[in-house]
Amino acid sequence: MGKYNLILSEYLSFVYNSQSAVQIPIYYSSNSELEKRCIDFHAKCVDNSKKGLSLSSLFEEYKDVIDNATLLSILSYSYDKYNAVERKLINYAKGKPLEADLTANELDYENNKITSELFKSAEEYTDSLMDPAILTSISSNLNAVMFWLERHSNDVGDANKVYRRRLDLFIIVASTINKYGVPRHNEKYRYEYEVMKDKPYYLVTWANSAIEMLMSVFSHEDYLIAKELIILSYSNRSTLAKLVSSPMSILVALIDINGTFITNEELELEFSDKYVKAIVPDQTFNELQEMIDNMKKAGLVDIPRMIQEWLVDCSLEKFTLMSKIYSWSFHVGFRKQKMIDAALDQLKTEYTEDVDNEMYNEYTMLIRDEIVKMLEVPVKHDDHLLRDSELAGLLSMSSASNGESRQLKFGRKTIFSTKKNMHVMDDIAHGRYTPGVIPPVNVDRPIPLGRRDVPGRRTRIIFILPYEYNSAQHAVVEKMLSYAKHTREYAEFYSQSNQLLSYGDVTRFLSSNSMVLYTDVSQWDSSQHNTQPFRKGIIMGLDMLANMTNDPKVVQTLNLYKQTQINLMDSYVQIPDGNVIKKIQYGAVASGEKQTKAANSIANLALIKTVLSRIANKYSFITKIIRVDGDDNYAVLQFNTDVTKQMVQEVSNDVRYIYSRMNAKVKALVSTVGIEIAKRYIAGGKIFFRAGINLLNNEKRGQSTQWDQAAILYSNYIVNKLRGFDTDREFILTKIIQMTSVAITGSLRLFPSERVLTTNSTFKVFDSEDFIIEYGTTDDEVYIQRAFMSLSSQKSGIADEIASSQTFKNYVSKLSDQLLVSKNAIVSKGIAVTEKAKLNSYAPVYLEKRRAQISALLTMLQKPVSFKSNKITINDILRDIKPFFVTTEAKLPIQYRKFMPTLPDNVQYVIQCIGSRTYQIEDSGSKSSISKLISKYSVYKPSIEELYKVISLREQEIQLYLVSLGVPPVDAGTYVGSRIYSQDKYKILESYVYNLLSINYGCYQLFDFNSPDLEKLIRIPFKGKIPAVTFILHLYAKLEIINYAIKNKSWISLFCNYPKSEMIKLWKKMWNITALRSPYTSANFFQD
């Protein structure tokens, strides 16, 4: 077994190093003889440890177990309640503790003062500004670092340099923490006033960030960057990340393009050897110099020096260092402000009368026209989604907060909850549900607020609107998004594209006679000036649309939507400030509506069009592309002469002047070679992503457990690694060890082994090899997977009670009755299951399920139940296939150039050999005809799991299913009798398998699975017509080859002679695959 188990046993002897500590390994085997020996071994170990005898004689006696069985878990027993962290920390606390500069930040509470100075008493105290919001403690983090340092203290050569760099940085952290003592966390991993009062307020979150940074140090440059950020972030809790990352927006404009990739007509990336010179006016250098000076003023030395040294020749080779600095800057942690400051931020901008009303007018009209263009077709055709918008809204109702806690009665049970879905049920039950009335959000009913914290930016507020707003906007927004899906201007929504496609779009039109204008409009989106023109544009669009239809239901839908806009033009918010709740008139647009993303994109598109139309009065150019992506927009302009410094300068000044005429405080830049937006940046013709995901601090607390968070931690580590920020893998594994251990009693803990955490089961947390998803096919792996499946679904008494109440049942049947033309058990059950699943976000239900899961897990980790599950998983399919494959060595030349310099070597190598992919593989079934047929007549959206179930039913049943959803019997009959139906069977199976194999996640999303270079390595003689079997054989072969290449940086070729007799068996099995949901899959989903 791999490295994990080795680290696990070393870690246990590191943490529990007293005389009394015992570690008992627990083994299991699928071989019944060996399994008996495993049980004996365990019994004797426990027996010996009770008597205080050594276990080493048993290890000899049961050598067969240790050699041939699989480690299941380690039981660790230790009574000294250890203040071991403090004891070990003293050895590292050799340096001078950091002293915070208490004037570093504008807002008093952002200075790292002693907690009792910021909060006079426990009543006043809040941890919300420094809460790491992660289910692991500062003491565990310190332990993990000290464990690593101890393990590597004897390293030699380059490894020793890494050790010395990290040791040096850890001495800073250790000395500072040791001065005040290690803060102890409570059982919810929070730090209370009593613990913090004599310590600096930001000590914990700073130390977590510092540890995350120092464990990501490898080179000398890393060391310099980390040291500077660790020391300065101790004092500067507000602007450090912004200062350090600001220069990037200019740096991307300084590198000549010498060869790049462009998007061709087929939407594929294709190499182009064009050369484009970076044309940079002096003013740009002055602005950059100013940024560097600001960095120096803030006390930075090495980072600005590195940037200045790079500026000498602006080479692409050394740009990776700039890229590194940009990524590192985010790891100083989140900037968490008080809500009152976050809200007032938008309201501080003075309102001036001196604006260009003509431009505002044009802006509003563009928004109006875009709204009309988006909705014209569905409105004129009286689209069923717009007619049944209320039902669609209910089906998609989220289980997020509705802004207030209410007392609700479900049967005999009375509960308090803030969840939207529960409020809706309650309102319907008591006749309070009035979808035709959108409650006002004025001074009488101010909006409660949520928050969004991001490193390097101010805290933003989020409206928590009543559920009526969600209901009213849902259907219309869906239609807006489906329009955006096939409109290239909307980079974020454009059909199945990914970031690589957007990259090729930009580079495609760059040349000596074009320039690219890129603007960050995040300030504008939340500014007061935007509110009136924005909402009015939408209202005018809706008015025009209402005249295009005679269907009262569609008109009603549009009117409700319009009402949400009218209400929000007069919005008040409630902000807790100390003990009082302030009501403030809030005249700006905030996130929180269903339309936020779509409407912002529309507004940003209108904004850049307005600006371009002004520029066009002065210059003659062709707009080659306009794109909007979230808070950013960019456009490539082609002139009829070569671009000069003078031109870049003038266009830049004109653009900024035009924005200022609208009072838009935005960052507008003009370049000839690259852009930088929030999601990605293009420099020297290559694409880069910011690797800025924090590992040891989280933005907010959700209801995920330690296991979930361990999986999220691993997933974040992988994303950062793909983007060029590499954290020590041993450290990540140590964190996983800590976060997945299960306490049995105070002194007894159970630590799962690698097999448990990496097997594709409901408990999977990480992959034993980065970037490679393995599906275990050995006897022991399948055995443990089956064992886990026996305890996968946990019941919750509270959820059952709610679900059996009249309130709940009535709600579900109301939905079913509105949705279905005739009875349909699959859909009715589906709705009930979905609604019941929404109850999971209600804490008591969640906790109850978790407790059951953990007690089952505890039983399982001490002895796996031999269990014959009749469920088939993807592992079983792959296990059936595997024996028929023969492997031979093969050669594949490197033939593509690099376009994403930050990728790890092995992933880069695979892309260079087989090519990359610019599209998402469809894994939801939405491209199948049955899915399109259903969405033509119904607002119901079946999941890929449901489609997979339905499509394998008998034809008669499929027909009934369709008819019950409102598909005319004629259409349903035609569908089942046509060839389309058998194509669908294959399409849906394909999507389902892709979905199970997470083909759009991790690094698999970068590889071209249909690469001819890859196909060349696979030989499968064609037998009979079972496309599904051919598909799975090919896909398995591709994954095997790619996984091998990632691991070994070399290629294999696969030959498969699959017997015809087995094909039918396999095909039958393929219609019974069970999907497994695990912390690992939800972490992947969470990345989305």
From Swiss-Prot:
One of its GO terms (cellular component) is virion component. Its cofactor is Mg(2+). It catalyses: RNA(n) + a ribonucleoside 5'-triphosphate = RNA(n+1) + diphosphate. One of its GO terms (biological process) is viral genome replication. Belongs to the reoviridae RNA-directed RNA polymerase family. RNA-directed RNA polymerase that is involved in both transcription and genome replication. Together with VP3 capping enzyme, forms an enzyme complex positioned near the channels situated at each of the five-fold vertices of the core. Following infection, the outermost layer of the virus is lost, leaving a double-layered particle (DLP) made up of the core and VP6 shell. VP1 then catalyzes the transcription of fully conservative plus-strand genomic RNAs that are extruded through the DLP's channels into the cytoplasm where they function as mRNAs for translation of viral proteins. This is RNA-directed RNA polymerase. It comes from Rotavirus A (strain RVA/Pig/Mexico/YM/1983/G11P9[7]) (RV-A). The lineage of its organism: Viruses, Riboviria, Orthornavirae, Duplornaviricota, Resentoviricetes.
